[in-house]
Curated annotation (Swiss-Prot):
This is Probable glycine dehydrogenase (decarboxylating) subunit 1. Gene3D superfamilies: Aspartate Aminotransferase, domain 1 (3.90.1150.10), Type I PLP-dependent aspartate aminotransferase-like (Major domain) (3.40.640.10). Belongs to the GcvP family. N-terminal subunit subfamily. GO terms for molecular function: glycine dehydrogenase (decarboxylating) activity. It catalyses: N(6)-[(R)-lipoyl]-L-lysyl-[glycine-cleavage complex H protein] + glycine + H(+) = N(6)-[(R)-S(8)-aminomethyldihydrolipoyl]-L-lysyl-[glycine-cleavage complex H protein] + CO2.
Amino acid sequence: MGYCPNTPDEIREMLAVIGAGSIEELFAPIPAELRAKSFDLPPGMSEFELMRIMREKAAAGGAEILPFIGGGIYDHIIPAAVDHLSSRAEFYTAYTPYQPECSQGTLQALFEYQTSICRLTGMEASNASLYDGGTAVAEAALMSLRITERNRVILDASVNPLHREIVTGYLHGLSAEAVEVAPDGCGSNLKALSGSIDEETAAVIVQNPNFFGSVQDFSELALKAHEKGALLIVSGYPIALGLVASPGEMGADIAVGDGQSLGNPLSFGGPYFGFIAARKRFIRNLPGRIVGETIDNQGRRGYVLTLQAREQHIKRHKATSNICSNQSLCALRGLIFCASLGKKGFEELALLNYDKAQYAKSRLSSLKGVTLMNAGTTFNEFTLSLPKDAAPVVEKLLSFGVAAGVPLGQYYPGMDSALAVTVTEKRSKAEIDRLAALLEEALCS
């Protein structure tokens, strides 16, 4: 059942009705010596801390996997308001809001979602969501081909390898190519990326933080791309945008990413949602649906699906994409998540993620034979070099109920000993110390 506390005004009104001057008067008949002096209650807890305790009691010792895995999908807190509001019948539907006269609530929610994404990314226009982060990167690549009328995309190899596969798949069959540029250690090779841009380049695609967890400034790369008439596409991790410079601040033309970390739980790969935002001058090349604000014939504010001539149900052969459904419910969860935290709360969440990952980075890299591979700033994720292959080490720790990270040898040849570890705000110091102890034991055996 719901719990709605009484406001001070409501309390005063109720006391006045029963003729009492204060709440204390209600307990006056109870002798003072019989009244409880203290209830011996622990200090107040956050919603997440209380949920953790209740889950521990419910599990009664049952084993659960402790995740230190990232690679694009992350284990973050989800305020109870997200589940409660997104499950309301008004929102919980697969219906596409083509009829604005009976869809104002849904349309306004999606309009506010677009506003939140623009504020996060530093961009001017957003659509109403895409399938996931990978398809968002690929749609941005196609968008750059349309805008520049060129046929070459440069892909930084420190972009999520699964997302790079999707880009390659999207470009297959088109008269376009994706050229990969190898990273410099665990960071983007900015010099090589700049040197790869030519008159046939439609866009340069980078990720910040990248797949190794490294954070970089791409402002100079944006200038180099623009000098050659190319675009800069930045794939971002939304939680990191509470601390790091937004794609817009770096001069990017298109910002994309996976919105899973905004109020959507880990769920065997989905459903999640992808976000895409761009400069206003590129709005007619944005894929998917866009919700706009307008005025009806009676002067009332209303919301509608706008610029629909870009979409396949109007001009299929000229459509910017063939997205037959989007992830509106997941995007709504993202909006509620952002609204629940607010600007200050979002910044505090990002800082908490950064601090906990910094502790884990220091703790794990101090183990014998373990070295940190990231040269500069990291966020959430960081990459360790182990004294042995990472895959069997991860397998061993999994038997103890700990998913230690992502072995990078499966994606990058020659990096068999590299392990990408992720630490979010949900991981406690005790859990990080447990990972360190188990990792140390596995490396010594």
